[in-house]
Each structure stands twice: as structure tokens, then as C-alpha cells.
Amino acid sequence: LKGALHTSSTRIGYPLQVHRSRPAAEQGTVLFEDDELTVRCTPLTHRVPAYAYRVDQKPLAGRFDIDKARSLGIPPGPVYARLKRGESVTLEDGRVIDGTTLCGPERPGVSVMICTDTVFCDAAVELARGVDLLIHESTFAHAEAEMAFQKQHSTSTMAAQTAAEAGVGQLAITHLSPRYVPGNPVSPDDLLKEAQAIFPNTV
């Protein structure tokens, strides 16, 4: 990473923290976690080490009911931020307002998984279970499945099979071979249709 930044004369103005994928993937532990996100990864099936990464947003606070706050005579301002966080606040008139009474139910966070270079593998299916969006490589068309296995890349149908078996919300196929350009016998639209035949909610 340092070499790439140096060679490209890239300067970043924020702290960079490196997390090693291999130990977390092999042990099935969390790669990264903070107050908002959890990141996990798993090894894939490819000629060189490759990993899938899943990011889960933690549950979000319920929506703040501004109309209810106004009806209680709570003036807009910084106090709203505290109430949105569910804190109890003492107003200037002495009333104590419990912020949780002004917020709706907790909302689930969203989840995204990116599946880099791989042929179809069970590990990807397991990590992707129930994810909202699966971004999956789709290098080859189904007709070139033999080549996909040789090169350890996925076909459009393998990506769709992963999505279907994992019960994901939506599949986005990416990493298409440059051979599938408009005007060629097989185009990106053909790969999309192949995937949609197995998993309709594919883009």
C-alpha cells in the first residue's frame, strides 16, 4: 500500500488504518467494527488469494417526530439532536422529556457484500445470506463456464446462483470481460438476461 501511494504520488489527508483480511477470513472473526458498521470477510476460490467483504450497518435510531415535539412546545434547536438520540432532556420550564417517546421504532441498517474474483463457492453463499445488495463479479457468459472454472472466475449464472441460494435482496453484476462489448455476438445485456433468468432482481 505504501509503495502504491508513493509510486502514484498520492497524498491522503486522513489517517489510514490497515486491517489484514486473511486472519479474519480464516478464523471467521470480524474484520472491523465501529459504532456504525461491522465488516466481515471470507476467502474465495481463485488462483491467488481473494476475499468477499460484507458490510452491515448497525440498526438506526427510530425517526424523530418533529410534529409531536412541536406540539409539546419544545423549541427547535440543539435539544432536538439530543432527543433524536433518545436522551432525556430537561427544558427551561423544568419539564423532563424522554427522547425515546418522540422516536419511532429502531430501523434496520442496510447490508452490502462485494464478491471479488472467484468461481462459484459455498463460502460466498454463506457470507451473503440475507444481504440487501450483493455485488458479484461476472466475468464470463454461461456458455463459457468451462473457461470460468479454469480461470476461477464466475459466469453470470454463477453470480445469480449465489444470490438465489443466499436469499439476497438485489444482485449487481460487475467485472464483465471486455470481450462482451456492444456489437459483439454476446453483449453485457446478454449476461444480464442470463443472470435475471435465475435471479430476476439483477442489475
Regions from the language model: what does each represent?
Residues 1-23:
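Active-site HxH/HxHxD metal-binding segment of metal-dependent hydrolases
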Residues 8-11, 30-32, 105, 194-197:
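Short, conserved catalytic or adaptor-binding loops enriched in Gly and charged residues
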Residues 12-17, 34-35, 109-110, 198-201:
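A short helix-to-beta-strand connector/capping loop
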Residues 17, 113, 170-172:
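A structural signal for isolated positions on well-ordered beta-strands in alpha/beta enzyme cores
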Residues 17-21, 40-42, 203:
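General small-molecule cofactor/ligand-binding pocket signal
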Residues 21, 121-203:
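Binuclear metal-ion centers of metallo-dependent hydrolases, dominated by the metallo-beta-lactamase
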Residues 21-26, 44-46:
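Residues that form or immediately flank small-molecule/cofactor binding pockets and catalytic motifs
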Residues 32-114, 118-127, 133-135:
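Active-site-proximal loop/helix segment associated with metal-binding centers of metalloenzymes
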